[in-house]
Amino acid sequence: TYISHAIQYIRNHYADDLKVVDIANYVCIDRSYLYKLFEKTLQMSPRDFLIRFRISRGKELLTITERSVEEIAAACGYKDFRAFSKVFKKLIGMSPSKYRTEHREEVRKRLYAAEQNLDELMKDENLLHLKQK
């Protein structure tokens, strides 16, 4: 479908200087028709989808990398990190730096819990092997 092709194009090119007209051209439809399809299907414009996709990717990079906010903004298709920060704060409710700080701790807790679960599984696995001998 046009929407799935458009979304795939966005996923592959979100870091580029991407415009809605580029997406429409890729899927071979008129820009206004692309807007109608997105509004009908996703209840948002293609531009809003692109912005939300970029910010979502930014959240991921803030959490799993040590890259600076400036580098992450550029990796998400923003030429100006201040514009990225402004949009990020508007959508997420906090600055990228604050998001990183708060969510890094959350990730650390999840990793610790996963390691504990793995340790328990390994103990269970060792017991299972001992019982089989």
Protein language model features and the residues they cover:
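An amphipathic alpha-helical interaction segment
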Residues: 1-8, 33
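Terminal helix-turn-helix DNA-binding modules in bacterial transcription factors
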Residues: 8, 12, 17, 21, ...
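Short hydrophobic/aromatic patch on the recognition helix
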Residues: 33-34, 38, 83-84, 88
